[in-house]
Structures are given as structure tokens and as C-alpha cells.
């Protein structure tokens, strides 16, 4: 029986993880649930159903509501609060697997606590690798943690790698394993056929209406701008130790092929399934074995048209910014991630237009005095400066 801590249990990844656990109660139990605390009713329901030992939130204003809700339902889960307690839950000797599904840099110290404890970590949070990939991979190597990416694209690549390579993420050279290129696929988002002149008018609701995936609002907007694909590009560099000429990006509308590996003998290994996050999460939970989940099997007769297109980079300026930043150092990717969080939040609040997201991100990259961070503290300092500058630009709108 593997005990699990879920960082971000009320989000999309957290909810899907719990569904898988529900169908595999002979294999997994929930040790602790962690959430910021905005969706208290959801968190209370999760505690009642899964009976974790602990639940912990960051939002102090919701602490009383959480305690009263659990008491009312006679739930014996212990309530904790704050960063220190979350770090302790992430590093507890009782825990076998940590699911890292927080948004942005908010979970950076929790994740590093898990790494230092040598945990098996299922990583859904791309932003942390975007902002501190160098430090992240060094810590993983030092403490011998097991990292399994569970976003669909990196998980697809991971599954297609030789077993020995899987155990050496961030260190192994793809050349030694006969790999020519990694191919990241992307649907192109909900606006792939919208006229460029009309993109300014699109609403947050339209941007969140992804054609293939059900996701949270932030990642849905990132998918619409293809910043998400840009972040995946950056993460692939760190996880799989590849350079510019070893990553290829392709538009694949159907999201059936999640990513591919092109080998030096001309063969291509592709990972295919219906677009459902439970596939990659279940792979991570069961690794190195596979576990059965209540998921639909891919029907090749119903899904018999798979298309591929080159990317129109004029349509996706955020993707361009991410690729450029990835070769300008850790500081640049940290700044881009931070600026993007603020600009996406402003768009969701209808303070700026959809097309302003890329404009603000570029302004912050151009105007901020970016330095190469040499510690987590310096990364957080750079993060703060980028956020403040982005907010300053937004006030001008």
C-alpha cells in the first residue's frame, strides 16, 4: 500500500488523481491533502471521502470553515496550516509518493522538501522547472529522487524512452541512446483558425474552452496562447537534457498523439491515447508497472484521421518568447513565467485583451534588469521583480 500526499488536491490534476485512487484502493491510500484553500467545500468533500491523515491549507481566512466543515461531518482528519506544515507533509517518512500539482512557484519549497527526502514525485507543475530547472535537476541528482512528469507531453516522451534513460533524467545524453529528436505535439488551442485581427476580441470564457482537454483556467489560457507549449519546450530541455536542434514542435489538432521520439534509424515511437489526464497520472502512480483505470480505450476506427501541421509562429508570439528565453538563461525563463502569471490573471479578470498577454510578457523581458540567479532566494527575488513590473504595465491599460 503506497501512501500519497497531493499538493493541489482541489485542482484538475488533484481531482483526477483521487479518481484513480478510488479505483485502486488496494494499492494506494491518501496520507495528506494540500490546497491553497479557496475551494473549501471541495476540500471538505475530499477529506470525507478519502479520509486522509492530514489536510493542510495556506489561506488562513478559510481555516475555521475547514475545521467546522470536518467537525460537522465527523471527519477525523487533522487540520494543519502554512508552509512549514506542508513541507513536513511532503517530506514525511510515512509518504511514498508526492503529487506536485500546485500552480506557479507557490509550491517550490514543498517540492524541494520532497526531493530532499528522496521521494517518488509525480510532477505536473511545469512552472517550477521553467523558473528553476537548473537547481531542480541538481537536487534530484543529489538526493536520488524519482521524478516522473505527468503532463501528457513529457509523460509521453518518458514512456517512450529506454528504461535506463528514465532513471537518468537530466543527466543522460540522448545521443548515447540512439535518439535523434524529441517531438512535442500541440493542438493549437481554441483559436487556431481564428483570424489574427479577431484575436483581440476573444473572451476569457472562449479562451478556456479548449477543444480537447478539460483543464484549469490558467493552463487553458496558456494553451490558447501556446505559452504552455513554450513552457513544455523549456521543461523538455531540463528533463531530457536536450539542445535546440533536438526538439521539434508540431501542431496535431486531435491530441491523440501526445508526443513522439524520433530515433537515428528513422523509426518514430509515438505515445497515443484519448486526451485524458488520468492516463499519464496512472502511469506515474503505478510506475514501473501499469495499473488499470476506468478510461476509454482508443478506437482507431472513430479516430482514423490524424493530422499534422507546422506552427505559424506569428499566431503564437508567447511560444516564440518562451523558446527565445530558454536560450537566454535561467533568469529569462524565470522572468517570463512570472510575468505570464500576472498577465494571464489580468486577462481572466478582463483588465487586458488576449493579445496583450504576449505584449506585457515581452515588455517585462525587455525592460527588467535580468540577472542569472545563483540560489532559490535569488529566483524568488527575480520572480517578485518581474511580477511587480508586469503589474505596473497592466495599470497603464
UniProtKB/Swiss-Prot annotation:
GO molecular function: 1-deoxy-D-xylulose-5-phosphate reductoisomerase activity; manganese ion binding; NADPH binding
Residues the record lists as binding 1-deoxy-D-xylulose 5-phosphate: 126, 152-153, 187, 210, 223, 228-229, 232
List of residues binding Mn(2+): 151, 153, 232
Keywords: Isoprene biosynthesis, Manganese, Metal-binding, NADP, Oxidoreductase
Pathway(s) served: Isoprenoid biosynthesis; isopentenyl diphosphate biosynthesis via DXP pathway; isopentenyl diphosphate from 1-deoxy-D-xylulose 5-phosphate: step 1/6
Enzyme class: oxidoreductase
A single BP term in Gene Ontology: isopentenyl diphosphate biosynthetic process, methylerythritol 4-phosphate pathway involved in terpenoid biosynthetic process
Catalysed reaction equations from the record: 2-C-methyl-D-erythritol 4-phosphate + NADP(+) = 1-deoxy-D-xylulose 5-phosphate + NADPH + H(+)
EC number(s) stated in the UniProt entry for this protein: 1.1.1.267
PANTHER family found in the cross-reference section: 1-DEOXY-D-XYLULOSE 5-PHOSPHATE REDUCTOISOMERASE (PTHR30525), 1-DEOXY-D-XYLULOSE 5-PHOSPHATE REDUCTOISOMERASE, CHLOROPLASTIC (PTHR30525:SF0)
Subunit (UniProt): Homodimer.
Recorded family membership: Belongs to the DXR family.
Function per UniProt: Catalyzes the NADPH-dependent rearrangement and reduction of 1-deoxy-D-xylulose-5-phosphate (DXP) to 2-C-methyl-D-erythritol 4-phosphate (MEP).
Name of the protein in its database record: 1-deoxy-D-xylulose 5-phosphate reductoisomerase
Organism: Wigglesworthia glossinidia brevipalpis
Amino acid at each position: 500500500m503506497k501512501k500519497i500526499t497531493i499538493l493541489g488536491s482541489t485542482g484538475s490534476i488533484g481531482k483526477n488523481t483521487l479518481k484513480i485512487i478510488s479505483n485502486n484502493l488496494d494499492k494506494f491510500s491518501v496520507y495528506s491533502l494540500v490546497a491553497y484553500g479557496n475551494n473549501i467545500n471541495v476540500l471538505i468533500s475530499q477529506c470525507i471521502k478519502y479520509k486522509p491523515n492530514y489536510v493542510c491549507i495556506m489561506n488562513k481566512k478559510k481555516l475555521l470553515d475547514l475545521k467546522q466543515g470536518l467537525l460537522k461531518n465527523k471527519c477525523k482528519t487533522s487540520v494543519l496550516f502554512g508552509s512549514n506544515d506542508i513541507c513536513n507533509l511532503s517530506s514525511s517518512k510515512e509518504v511514498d509518493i508526492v503529487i506536485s500539482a500546485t500552480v506557479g512557484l507557490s509550491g517550490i519549497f514543498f517540492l524541494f522538501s520532497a526531493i530532499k527526502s528522496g521521494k517518488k514525485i509525480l510532477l505536473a507543475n511545469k512552472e517550477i522547472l521553467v523558473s528553476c530547472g537548473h537547481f531542480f535537476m541538481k537536487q534530484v541528482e543529489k538526493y536520488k529522487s524519482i521524478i516522473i512528469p505527468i503532463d501528457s507531453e513529457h509523460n509521453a516522451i518518458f514512456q517512450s524512452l529506454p528504461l535506463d534513460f528514465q532513471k537518468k533524467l537530466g543527466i543522460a545524453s540522448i545521443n548515447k541512446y540512439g535518439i535523434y529528436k524529441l517531438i512535442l505535439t500541440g493542438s493549437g488551442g481554441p483559436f487556431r483558425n481564428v483570424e489574427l485581427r479577431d484575436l483581440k476580441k476573444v473572451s476569457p470564457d472562449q479562451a478556456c474552452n479548449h477543444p480537447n482537454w478539460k483543464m484549469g483556467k490558467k493552463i487553458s489560457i496558456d494553451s490558447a496562447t501556446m505559452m504552455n507549449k513554450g513552457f513544455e519546450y523549456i521543461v523538455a530541455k531540463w528533463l531530457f537534457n536536450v539542445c535546440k536542434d533536438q526538439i521539434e514542435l508540431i501542431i496535431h489538432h486531435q491530441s491523440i498523439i501526445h508526443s513522439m521520439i524520433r530515433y537515428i534509424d528513422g523509426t518514430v515511437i509515438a505515445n497515443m491515447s484519448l486526451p485524458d489526464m488520468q492516463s499519464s497520472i496512472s502511469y506515474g502512480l503505478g510506475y514501473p508497472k501499469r495499473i488499470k483505470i476506468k478510461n476509454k480505450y482508443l478506437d482507431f476506427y472513430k479516430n482514423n484521421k490524424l493530422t499534422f501541421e507546422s506552427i505559424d509562429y506569428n499566431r503564437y508570439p508567447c511560444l516564440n518568447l518562451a523558446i527565445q528565453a530558454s536560450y537566454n538563461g535561467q533568469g529569462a525563463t524565470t522572468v517570463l513565467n512570472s510575468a505570464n502569471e500576472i498577465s494571464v490573471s489580468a486577462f481572466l479578470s478582463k483588465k487586458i485583451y488576449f493579445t496583450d498577454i504576449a505584449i506585457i510578457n515581452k515588455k517585462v523581458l525587455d525592460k527588467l534588469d535580468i540577472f542569472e540567479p545563483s540560489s532559490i532566494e535569488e529566483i524568488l527575488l527575480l520572480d517578485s521583480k518581474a511580477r511587480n513590473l508586469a503589474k505596473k504595465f497592466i495599470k497603464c491599460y
